[in-house]
């Protein structure tokens, strides 16, 4: 079913309610990282320039639901957004009974989590949101996996419900990487535990030619292949599961690794052949030979899906593997999609953001989409798309 797009609708003079993900870090009353606000700017500007009465809603932090808490107020976001837009953005605290907004004006509603019933997708609250608008725009992919009143319920009852440009672009990029990808497809799945990425691995094996595993996940696959992993993070109870996955899809394993005797920023890094790992070693990165082999695989790929680093890149001496892969992806002609908090941090650290085809804004939503799960906020837009 086709989802309506905001860009296809006439917004002039309409009350347009946009759910954005403006959940940004705030320090001393100021926004300390505005990536999410900047990501939402094109949507907000498009609605404003079309002459809509623009109303924005988002959550911020994890306040107790139904209780106003100044520490989780959207006030710093309204101020920062006003600076970026070059016009005042009014913060409206009490809006559920209706608000007056001028054509071309942008207002921001106070934190949706201050409303009782938001997280439980309360129907009465959803209907109150819906009554505020002529058109509801869902543009927050990062919250699309949660059925809440501001992401799901409101879309059921609004006169018209559609996807904003940010959400539409996200779904298009994910579809391109997963539905009918150009082959060969190589995925990088990093992270500390196989258990948290099991559904991802099971879903990816159906579309991938190879899956490069990294971090603690790789240690479990190394142990499953009979290699020593010393005192590395490893899920020994999932060794049979790892063997099972490796029997169904090609999982290239490290031939050399970077080890240390402790997990610390000051730890000394030593490169070893995989067969030389001792009982006292912790594997904290892939070695240079492995990084080169993985880079070669990425060079030949037509589609690359990246979720998770292959080493403890936060410590520079264990970041070379992730850096080498980031650079290989940047130099590749493949369609590349990166997603997940740690991955985005690595993309930023190694300065390759402009060389990746698409960087997903969603953490949990990105993973659930890759796993093939239905995202409630997307499903309701499909239902309303007819």
UniProtKB/Swiss-Prot annotation:
GO terms for biological process: gluconeogenesis; glycolytic process. It comes from the Bacteria. Its main location: cytoplasm. ATP binds at residues 197, 314, 340-343. It is an enzyme of class 2 (transferase). Pathway: Carbohydrate degradation; glycolysis; pyruvate from D-glyceraldehyde 3-phosphate: step 2/5. Substrate binds at residues 21-23, 36, 59-62, 113, 146. It holds the Pfam family PGK. Its EC number is 2.7.2.3. One of its GO terms (molecular function) is phosphoglycerate kinase activity. The keyword Cytoplasm applies. Keywords: ATP-binding, Cytoplasm, Glycolysis, Kinase, Nucleotide-binding, Transferase. Monomer. PANTHER family: PHOSPHOGLYCERATE KINASE, PHOSPHOGLYCERATE KINASE 1, CHLOROPLASTIC-RELATED. Belongs to the phosphoglycerate kinase family. This is Phosphoglycerate kinase. It comes from Marinobacter nauticus (strain ATCC 700491 / DSM 11845 / VT8). The lineage of its organism: Bacteria, Pseudomonadati, Pseudomonadota, Gammaproteobacteria, Pseudomonadales.
């Amino acid at each position: 079913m086709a989802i309506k797009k905001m860009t296809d609708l006439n917004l002039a003079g309409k009350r347009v309610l946009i759910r954005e993900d403006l959940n940004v870090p705030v320090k001393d009353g100021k926004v300390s990282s505005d990536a999410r606000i900047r990501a939402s700017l094109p949507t907000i500007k498009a609605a404003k320039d079309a002459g809509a009465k623009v109303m924005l809603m988002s959550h911020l932090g994890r306040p107790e639901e139904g209780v106003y808490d100044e520490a989780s107020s959207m006030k710093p976001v309204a101020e920062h957004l006003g600076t970026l837009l070059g016009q005042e953005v009014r913060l409206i605290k009490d809006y559920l009974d209706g608000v007056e907004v001028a054509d071309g004006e942008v207002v921001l509603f106070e934190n949706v989590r201050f409303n009782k019933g938001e997280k439980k997708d309360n129907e009465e609250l959803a209907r109150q949101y819906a009554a505020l608008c002529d058109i509801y725009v869902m543009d927050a992919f990062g919250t699309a996996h949660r059925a809440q009143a501001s992401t799901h319920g409101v879309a059921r009852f609004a006169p018209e419900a559609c996807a904003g440009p940010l959400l539409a672009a996200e779904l298009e990029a994910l579809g391109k990487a997963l539905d009918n990808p150009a082959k060969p497809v190589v995925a990088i799945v990093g992270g500390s535990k196989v258990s948290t990425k099991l559904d991802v691995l099971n879903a990816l094996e159906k579309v991938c030619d190879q899956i490069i595993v990294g971090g603690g996940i790789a240690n479990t696959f190394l142990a499953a292949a009979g290699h020593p992993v010393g005192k590395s993070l490893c899920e020994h109870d999932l060794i049979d599961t790892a063997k099972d996955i490796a029997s169904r899809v090609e999982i290239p394993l490290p031939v050399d690794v970077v080890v240390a005797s402790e997990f610390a920023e000051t730890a000394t890094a030593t490169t070893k052949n995989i067969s030389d790992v001792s009982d006292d070693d912790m594997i904290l990165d892939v070695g240079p030979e492995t990084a080169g082999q993985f880079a070669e695989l990425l060079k030949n790929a037509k589609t690359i899906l990246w979720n998770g680093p292959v080493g403890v890149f936060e410590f520079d001496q264990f970041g070379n593997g992730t850096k080498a892969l980031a650079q290989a992806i940047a130099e590749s002609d493949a369609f590349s999609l990166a997603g997940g908090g740690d991955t985005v941090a690595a993309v930023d650290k190694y300065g390759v953001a402009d060389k990746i085809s698409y960087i997903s804004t969603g953490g949990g939503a990105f993973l659930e989409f890759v796993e093939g799960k239905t995202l409630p906020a997307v499903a309701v837009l499909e239902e309303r798309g007819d």
